[in-house]
Amino acid sequence: MANKSASLRPDSKNHFLAMRLEGLFKTVTVRTAAGQTEPRQSLREIGRDQVSFTFENVRGTLVGFRQPHYLQGVGIAGDHLHFITEDRKKGGHVLALESDGEVEVKAAQMYTMTLELPKGDQEFNEATLVGSHKDLKAVEG
């Protein structure tokens, strides 16, 4: 896996990288949050109820992005991957993974980004969108 992940390092730390890994994984550890129980809960509140699972000898797909650090806040800087099993019944946010090599790796460096915001949405207009870096670290690690 280390050899394949080295090929995912783009020649620029300032571009996005889209990734897809598909195959047999020795282990994949994921976490899943329970979801909101009321509107506008903070990320930290939602993250308190997350649970972790480790799948062993599992086939599935990981998809995600490597986001440049200067865009922290628009998204999550660094690697952000999600996993779903081949039968599409289990998955979550990837915390750790290990493979013996039966994995197909696809990646593409991205040079454009479009950010579309809601128009005419009063709730969005009044929302406090700046999150706490501490809350993000507590949930994302």
Specify the residue positions occupied by each region the protein language model found.
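Hydrophobic alpha-helical segments and helix pairs
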Residues: 1-6
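Long, positively charged binding patches that form subdomain-scale interaction surfaces
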Residues: 7-65, 72-74
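A short, structural micro-pattern
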Residues: 13, 56-59, 75, 88, ...
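Residues in well-ordered beta-strands of folded domains
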Residues: 20-22, 31, 63-66, 82, ...
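Short, solvent-exposed amphipathic alpha-helical segments in soluble enzyme
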Residues: 35-37, 79-80, 98-99
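Histidine-centered divalent-metal-coordination microenvironment in nucleic-acid enzymes
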Residues: 76-84
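A hydrophobic, small-residue-rich beta->alpha segment in the mid-to-C-terminal subdomain
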Residues: 85-128
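Well-ordered alpha/beta subsegment
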Residues: 119, 127-141
